[in-house]
A protein has these predicted regions:
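Active-site groove signature of glycoside hydrolases
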Residues: 116-148, 172-174, 284
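Active-site neighborhood of glycoside hydrolase catalytic domains
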Residues: 148-175, 181-184, 199-209, 235-241
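Aromatic-rich peripheral "rim/lid" segments of glycoside hydrolase catalytic domains that contact
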Residues: 1-12, 16, 27, 256-268, ...
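Active-site clefts of carbohydrate-active enzymes
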Residues: 88-90, 139, 143, 173-184, ...
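N-terminal substrate-binding region of glycoside hydrolase catalytic domains
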Residues: 1-112, 132, 136-138, 213, ...
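Conserved, mostly hydrophobic/aromatic
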Residues: 122, 131, 212, 248, ...
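Alpha-helical scaffolding within the catalytic cores
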Residues: 22-31, 64-68, 115-119, 181-204, ...
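Aromatic- and acid-rich polysaccharide-binding/catalytic face
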Residues: 41-45, 126-129, 133-135, 173-175, ...
Length: 340
C-alpha cells in the first residue's frame, strides 16, 4: 500500500478474515465488506513447522494461504497486522499441528528454528508495521510455567533478528485480558485476586514489548455488557506508557448455551473499550465482521480431522460479528463506524 493507515496517529480498525461460510465467494465478499468497515485485516496463521524448519524460503500450502490473504487485502486497500501463532487458537494450552515426533516445548531447537524462520519470512515478504509473536500467551504460561522462560528467550532472539533487518517493525505478543485480570475462577493458579492483573506475565517481556496488546471476550464473564466495570480495561494505561492495542475480541449478541446476551450488550462492550482505552489504541480488532455459520465450519473442521471439541468451542464465538450471517447490520455496527 502506498499509504499505510498505521502512518496516522488515530486508531486503526480491523477484523479477522473469517467468512460467514467456508466458500470462495464468501471470502471475496468478506474482504470487500471489511474494506468498507475497517482499515486492516488481522493475519493470524499457525506455523508451517515442516516447511519453516527447513529454511526461511520455501513453497507450501500454508505459505500460499498467507500470500493469498495479503493479495486480497491489498486488492481491497486493506493493511495487515500479523500475529504468528504457535498454539491452538481454541485451546492455547497446546501447540498447533506440531509434527508427531517433535517435543512439545519452546526449548525444542526445531520449534525455535521454524518459528524464527517464519518470522523472518513474514518480515522479508510483507514488511508488516505490527508483528505479533504469540496470541494470548499468558494462557500458555499458566498451563506450562516451566516452558514460559523458553518462549520468552525465543521471543527476545526473534526481536533482535527482526529489529536488525526492519527496525521500524513494532513487535509484541498478546495477552488474554480476562484471564490476566483473574475474572475466571482458576483455583489451580493459587490465590489470585479478581481484577488484580498478573502484570509480571506482561513485564517478563520488557523491555522488548513495543505494544501492550490484549484480547478480551467478556461475555464469558459478565451477564450483560452493562456489567463490564468502568475501570475494566483502563488499568493498562496506568501500568504502561507504551502504545496499547485490542488485538482481538468481541461480545456475543445471541442467547445460546448458558449465554443470554443481546445486541445491546455488544454496544455496551464497544463503548466500554472506547471510553476506557479510546485514543490510546494503535489498533482495534473486532474478531468478526459477520457472524458465521457454525455448521459450515464444523463440516470443514471435520474434513481436516480436527478434534470435534474444537468445533464446539468455536460455536461460542459464532455471534460476535457486527453484522448477522447474511450481512444485516447489528446496532453495534453504527457505533463502530462512529468511532472510526
Amino acid at each position: 500500500l502506498e499509504e499505510s493507515v498505521f502512518d496516522s496517529t488515530s486508531t486503526a480498525y480491523g477484523f479477522y478474515p473469517s467468512p460467514p461460510e467456508i466458500t470462495f465467494e464468501s471470502v471475496f465478499q468478506l474482504f470487500k465488506d471489511m474494506a468498507i468497515h475497517g482499515d486492516f485485516v488481522l493475519v493470524q496463521q499457525n506455523v508451517d513447522w515442516e516447511s519453516f524448519v527447513l529454511g526461511v524460503d520455501g513453497v507450501s500450502q500454508k505459505r500460499t494461504d498467507i500470500i493469498n490473504q495479503i493479495t486480497l487485502a491489498r486488492q481491497n486497500n486493506l493493511d495487515a497486522v500479523f500475529v504468528l501463532d504457535a498454539l491452538n487458537g481454541l485451546n492455547r494450552r497446546e501447540f498447533d499441528g506440531l509434527p508427531a515426533n517433535w517435543e512439545t516445548s519452546f526449548a525444542n531447537p526445531d520449534v525455535r528454528t521454524a518459528f524464527k524462520n517464519y518470522a523472518l519470512w513474514v518480515v522479508r515478504n510483507f514488511q508488516p508495521r505490527y508483528l505479533g509473536l504469540a496470541s494470548e500467551i499468558n494462557t500458555y504460561m499458566d498451563a506450562h510455567p516451566n516452558d514460559a522462560q523458553n518462549f520468552i528467550s525465543l521471543y527476545n532472539e526473534i526481536y533482535a533478528l527482526v529489529k536488525a533487518e526492519a527496525p521500524e517493525t513494532q513487535i509484541f505478543v498478546t495477552f488474554q485480558w480476562d484471564d490476566l485480570n483473574n475474572v475466571f475462577p482458576q483455583p489451580e493458579e493459587g490465590d489470585r485476586q479478581r481484577f488484580s492483573p498478573n502484570w509480571e506475565q506482561v513485564e517478563a517481556f520488557e523491555p522488548n514489548l513495543d505494544v501492550w496488546a490484549i484480547s478480551s471476550y467478556p461475555y464469558f464473564v459478565f451477564q450483560s455488557g452493562a456489567d463490564i466495570p468502568t475501570d475494566y480495561y483502563s488499568p493498562l494505561l496506568e501500568r504502561t506508557s507504551k502504545p496499547v492495542a485490542f488485538a482481538e475480541g468481541g461480545f456475543s449478541t445471541q442467547a445460546f448455551a448458558e449465554f443470554t446476551h443481546s445486541p445491546e450488550d455488544q454496544v455496551a462492550y464497544l463503548n466500554a473499550i472506547h471510553v476506557q482505552l479510546g485514543p490510546h489504541m494503535v489498533f482495534w480488532v473486532n474478531t468478526l465482521l459477520n457472524d458465521f455459520n457454525i455448521d459450515s465450519y464444523a463440516k470443514e473442521m471435520a474434513s481436516q480431522g480436527r478434534n470435534p471439541e474444537d468445533a464446539q468451542m468455536l460455536a461460542n464465538f459464532a455471534y460476535i460479528g457486527l453484522r448477522e450471517f447474511d450481512g444485516t447490520p447489528k446496532p453495534a455496527l453504527a457505533v463502530w463506524e462512529s468511532f472510526r
